[in-house]
Structures are given as structure tokens and as C-alpha cells.
């Protein structure tokens, strides 16, 4: 999936461009002055809904449900001047379906410096919590890190990748921060956003989509009402998931479970064309076909879904160019 730009809205007329540049310059002068004397936290937080929705529509292949749920939840949360709790999203689905891509887009379109922002915190089990025997130290460090950074900036984004590989018991230290009753002195921690990413529930999502296809239902007809329960059960039944016995799901601290559907051949083709455009290359039928031919689709008797979504598209394009 192609990398994001700050806004994918095309330029309009020359007059409109001149006005936009003038307005941007005036806005920059005022905001720069304010940021020099004010809070860098608030200045770094610059939501761009138009850019986000445009990028999701153009580059996120086959995920009507995820796109709708994320945008709706985010808009409702940010339009509330006094939210009662942080926004907590849990992204679920097969590998390569766009979970990490969406989380990176959120960072990109919410913060001026995107993933490089000091207010965006990205955690990976392999990098940050590699040794299960150090669990108690990790719990202490994680709680301290979250509380300290929320004290500095309430508009913080915390991304937790590969929840399937996170040591059970670690994430329970976040439980007080995800509800409405915790007190972090000096800041409104309820303005924070937490995003959890995992493959758990992917098989169950795939099965629902496969059954819909067999029943000749459009995938756009699949809703959260039929996917939410199977995802929740898959998480609760998985002793290796970071939410295992954490109380987070049991106490309903997740605002939205976001399902990512398996990708079909035409979705992978969409990813290939997007990646070629991102590289500044014209569409080449032989490259597109070569990537599709090298992609494994499942199930074996009905090769419908890509086994790794669009995850390998970029590397395969480089190989076939």
C-alpha cells in the first residue's frame, strides 16, 4: 500500500491556489507565534480529516468496514471537547490486510510530524518486550512511560503492534488509563488514543467472508454485528494474546473492534497499481500479472483470498521490474 502524503486532495484553480497559499501563510504566522509561546503538544496535534479520508479511499484496498468504523469513531471522539474516556481501537485481521497501514495513516494525519512525533508511541513486543522473564520490569516501565507522556501531552497516540506476541499480563497495567476514572495530574488523559493491532480473529473473519461469498452476498453487506462477536471470542479464547485475562475486554474498555477482511485478487491488483504510482511508474500489465501469479491464494479448493494480503507487493514489484 502506497505511503501517505500529508493531503491527497488535488489542487484547484490558479486563483484557488493563490488564495490557499496566502491563507496558509497567514495561518502559519499566527500558529507559529502561538506555538513559540504556547504548548508544543497542541501545536503538534493537527488533525486532517480530509487527507485521511482521501488516503483511505484511494489506497486502502477492500476494507469498506474498517474505513467506515475508524473514521466514524475518530470524528466522534475529536469533535467532543470533553471526552469521558480515551479512544481505544482494536484492529483485527489476516496479515497484509492494512492494519499497520491504517495505524500509520492515523499518526500521519493527526500529528504534524506523523510517526516521528514525540507524542506518537509505537510499541513492538519483539523490540520493546522481548523477554517474558522480565515481565514485572516491563509492566513498571510501561506504566511509567504512559503516565509520564500523558502528563506531558494529553493528545498522545499509543500504538501496540502484534498483540498476539505480547506477554499476557503486561497490558493489564494500561487498564486504568483506558477507562473514565483514572486521574493523571496536570493533564486530561481522556484525550489520548490507544490502538491495538493483532492477527487474532483473522481466521474467523476469513470464514465469515468466505461463507458470504459462497452465499453470493456482497462483502460490503458484511457488518460489525456478525464479525464483532467472533472476533471477541477469538481473543478471549487465545491465551497468547495480550488481552488474555487483562480485564480490558471484560470491562468493555475497547470502543471499537475493527475487522480487516481478507483480500481478493482484484484488491491485490489495486495494491500493485497503487505501489507503481507511488514509485512514479506507469502501470505495466506484465508486472501486475507477474505479481498476481506469484501470490498464493486460499483456500486450496477455492483460491479466493491472498495468503499475505498486500504485504509482499512492494518487494515483488522490485523483483519483477
From Swiss-Prot:
Query: Where located?
Result: Endoplasmic reticulum lumen
Signal peptide from the UniProt entry: 1-26
What Gene3D superfamilies does this protein map onto? P-loop containing nucleotide triphosphate hydrolases
User: GO molecular function terms here?
Assistant: ATP binding; ATP hydrolysis activity; identical protein binding
Q: Which Pfam families match?
A: TOR1A_C, Torsin
Q: Where does ATP bind?
A: 93-100
- Give the keywords, sorted: ATP-binding, Endoplasmic reticulum, Glycoprotein, Nucleotide-binding, Signal
Q: Which InterPro entries match?
A: ClpA/B, P-loop_NTPase, TOR1A_C, Torsin, Torsin_1/2
Glycosylation sites noted in the Swiss-Prot or TrEMBL record = 149
Q: What is its main location?
A: endoplasmic reticulum
Q: Which GO terms describe its biological process?
A: chaperone cofactor-dependent protein refolding
Annotated Gene Ontology cellular components are: endoplasmic reticulum lumen; nuclear envelope
The record's note on quaternary structure and interaction partners says: Homohexamer. Interacts with TOR1AIP1.
Protein name according to UniProt: Torsin-2A
Species annotation = Bos taurus (Bovine)
Amino acid at each position: 500500500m502506497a505511503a501517505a502524503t500529508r493531503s491527497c486532495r488535488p489542487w484547484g484553480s490558479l486563483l484557488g491556489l493563490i488564495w490557499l497559499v496566502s491563507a496558509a501563510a497567514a495561518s502559519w504566522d499566527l500558529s507559529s507565534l502561538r506555538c513559540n509561546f504556547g504548548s508544543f503538544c497542541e501545536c503538534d496535534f493537527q488533525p486532517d480529516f480530509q487527507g485521511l479520508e482521501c488516503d483511505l479511499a484511494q489506497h486502502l484496498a477492500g476494507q469498506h468496514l474498517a474505513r467506515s468504523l475508524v473514521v466514524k469513531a475518530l470524528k466522534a471522539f475529536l469533535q467532543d471537547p470533553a471526552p469521558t474516556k480515551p479512544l481505544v481501537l482494536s484492529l483485527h485481521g489476516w496479515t497484509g490486510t492494512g492494519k499497520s497501514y491504517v495505524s500509520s495513516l492515523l499518526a500521519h494525519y493527526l500529528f504534524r510530524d506523523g510517526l516521528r512525533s514525540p507524542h506518537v508511541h509505537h510499541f513492538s513486543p519483539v523490540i520493546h518486550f522481548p523477554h517474558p522473564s522480565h515481565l514485572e520490569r516491563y509492566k513498571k516501565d510501561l506504566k511509567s512511560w504512559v503516565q509520564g507522556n500523558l502528563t506531558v501531552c494529553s493528545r498522545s497516540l499509543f500504538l501496540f503492534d502484534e498483540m498476539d506476541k505480547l506477554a499476557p499480563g503486561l497490558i493489564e497495567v494500561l487498564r486504568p488509563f483506558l477507562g473514565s476514572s483514572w486521574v493523571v495530574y496536570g493533564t486530561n488523559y481522556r484525550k489520548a488514543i490507544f490502538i491495538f493491532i493483532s492477527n487474532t480473529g483473522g481466521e474467523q473473519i476469513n470464514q465469515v467472508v468466505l461463507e458470504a461469498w459462497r452465499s453470493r452476498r456482497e462483502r460490503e453487506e458484511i457488518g460489525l454485528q456478525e464479525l464483532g462477536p467472533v472476533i471477541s471470542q477469538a481473543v478471549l479464547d487465545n491465551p497468547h494474546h495480550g488481552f488474555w485475562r487483562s480485564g480490558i475486554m471484560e470491562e468493555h474498555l475497547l470502543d471499537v473492534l475493527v475487522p480487516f477482511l481478507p483480500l481478493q485478487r482484484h484488491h491485490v491488483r489495486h495494491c500493485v497499481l497503487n505501489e507503481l504510482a507511488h514509485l512514479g511508474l506507469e502501470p505495466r500489465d506484465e508486472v501486475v500479472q507477474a505479481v498476481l501469479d506469484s501470490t498464493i491464494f486460499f483456500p486450496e479448493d477455492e483460491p479466493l483470498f491472498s495468503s499475505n494480503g498486500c504485504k509482499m507487493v512492494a518487494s515483488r514489484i522490485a523483483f519483477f521490474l
